[in-house]
């Protein structure tokens, strides 16, 4: 998980996840597709809060903490990012109301973004909190579907209508084009910072060649 800068990573992760999801919803709202039906008691956030905590921790341990690191050790950061992101996206195709495009979108939004969040910090708390904030904001606060599933109790009961390109349809806002664009921008920034900080690992064969050449 990493012991350094835990509080900083938690705060930054929450802010980033919240902002990315809020921008996604904002686009839907500006296009007239987001309507608030009712505002419910604060206790209504407990079910989606619990779900967001569980899914973010479990999925990040599996995909970034285990799968990504195993692949990265042999094949390097770039190949590991691509493989783990594709697996993450394809697994979500089995979700309700999902599709191949939704899965590919999640590969970019979550797979690459969260993978690079780990690479940048070498700390699981950062991607866990981004993941949590994204799901929590989308479901508990804005009352939207998350990866094809909609909670019955949320802080805001909302209705989302309009072009599925911008709403994500029944899959939820994370299936929208703007969600992919916003997350891709954040991914590019993290890639730049990761390269600048020297956090990118080479494939084992390049490391071996370099060491043999040096010796």
Q: Can you name each region flagged by the protein language model?
A:
Residues 1-61, 68-73, 203, 210-215:
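Juxtamembrane helix-loop-helix connectors linking adjacent transmembrane helices
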Residues 10-15, 45-46, 78-83, 104-105, ...:
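Hydrophobic alpha-helical transmembrane segments
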Residues 16, 20-24, 55, 84, ...:
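Alpha-helical transmembrane segments of multipass membrane proteins
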Residues 21-24, 51-52, 56, 76-93, ...:
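Small-polar-interrupted transmembrane alpha-helices in polytopic inner-membrane proteins
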Residues 24-29, 88-95, 114, 142, ...:
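Structural signal for membrane-spanning alpha-helices in multi-pass inner-membrane proteins
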Residues 58-83, 87, 116-123:
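Membrane-interface helix/loop boundary segments of multi-pass membrane proteins
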Residues 103-164:
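Functionally important transmembrane alpha-helices
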Residues 137-215:
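C-terminal membrane module of polytopic membrane proteins
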């Amino acid at each position: 998980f990493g012991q350094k800068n835990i509080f900083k990573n938690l705060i930054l992760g929450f802010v980033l996840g919240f902002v990315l999801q809020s921008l996604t919803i904002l686009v839907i709202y500006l296009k007239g597709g987001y309507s608030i039906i009712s505002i419910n008691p604060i206790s209504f956030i407990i079910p989606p809060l619990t779900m967001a905590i569980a899914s973010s921790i479990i999925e990040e341990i599996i995909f970034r903490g285990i799968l990504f690191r195993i692949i990265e050790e042999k094949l390097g950061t770039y190949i590991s990012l691509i493989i783990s992101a594709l697996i993450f996206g394809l697994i979500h195709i089995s979700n309700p109301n999902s599709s191949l495009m939704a899965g590919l979108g999640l590969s970019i939004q979550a797979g690459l973004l969260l993978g690079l969040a780990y690479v940048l910090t070498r700390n699981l708390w950062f991607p866990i909190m981004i993941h949590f904030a994204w799901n929590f904001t989308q479901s508990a606060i804005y009352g939207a579907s998350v990866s094809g599933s909609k909670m019955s109790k949320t802080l805001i009961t909302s209705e989302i209508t309009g072009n599925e390109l911008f709403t994500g349809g029944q899959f939820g806002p994370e299936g929208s084009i703007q969600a992919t664009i916003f997350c891709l921008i954040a991914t590019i920034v993290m890639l730049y910072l990761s390269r600048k900080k020297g956090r990118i690992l080479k494939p084992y064969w390049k490391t071996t060649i370099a060491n043999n050449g040096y010796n």
